[in-house]
């Protein structure tokens, strides 16, 4: 069996990444597959956005399409609550720091970063919670069994370490020629191949089977290449 790494470029506020959440969960179940998360910082700095009518009218059609294509749930508290809360701000930096902190706070637990990302996405898209706020993120970490060490790790991952992480992710995107989020890429023997996930949205079992097959192969796959899957651009969903 070959050593294989699956790189996942994501953003916590990318709706299509939420649509691909079952694919990430399935990948984490594949024995022998090393899954690495790379937050891209889609809505950070000048791209942070306060919630308002413009943002709501922009994201809702995309969210409804995501729900239709992937089966992922969107809650009333998100559509009628968070998206109408003009005091809320969409900022990718804090939730990405929380994903990094989940890994840092419990290095021995494989998949904890992915679990944190999934919990953050559910909190946002189903429960309508403010995932850019530190107390909310610490509460989500506590739900996953992370204690005081998570708060310390969260603070340690913020600021310059987080900016460095975003820069590393952007360099990887450039290397892959990735147009946006989500992007999955397999690495074997230093060679990177972007996977076309479009046919697998809403089909996590088929995706898991593909990855298991890749672990047994010495070469590529007919799933490699072709960016057919819908994406969020680096600075927002399209």
What are these regions (language model features)?
Residues 15, 33, 43, 91, ...:
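Generic hydrophobic/packing signal
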Residues 21-28, 119-238:
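C-terminal cap of thioredoxin/glutaredoxin-like
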Residues 10-13:
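Short pre-active-site segment immediately N-terminal to redox-active cysteine/selenocysteine motifs
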Residues 18-124, 225-232, 237:
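Structural alpha/beta surface segment adjacent to cysteine/selenocysteine redox centers
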Residues 1-7:
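Extreme N-terminal starter segment of soluble prokaryotic enzymes
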Residues 6, 114-115, 196-197:
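Alpha-helical interaction segments
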